[in-house]
Amino acid sequence: MYKQKKKNHPFQCKKKKKKKKKKKKKIKLLFNYFLFFNFIITTFSDDKQLGFILFHYFKIIEVIIKDN
């Protein structure tokens, strides 16, 4: 009896190591943005500016939540 040589398959897949993603603290981020938002409200009290700022503020929060 002779031993058969193990043939490496040409398309042999090597197991890739999975990188662990660091989880960001959503609550802390949202709280920081909330403080920032309050600061903006106190500085700009005009109705037109407030509506514009509110819109952008909520857009930013949506992006942050989607990323996390």
Swiss-Prot record:
Its main location: membrane. Residues 1-20 are annotated as: Disordered. One of its GO terms (cellular component) is membrane. The chain crosses the membrane at residues 27-44. It is a single-pass membrane protein. Keywords: Membrane, Transmembrane, Transmembrane helix. It is found in: Membrane. It comes from the Eukaryota. This is Putative uncharacterized transmembrane protein DDB_G0285787. It comes from Dictyostelium discoideum.
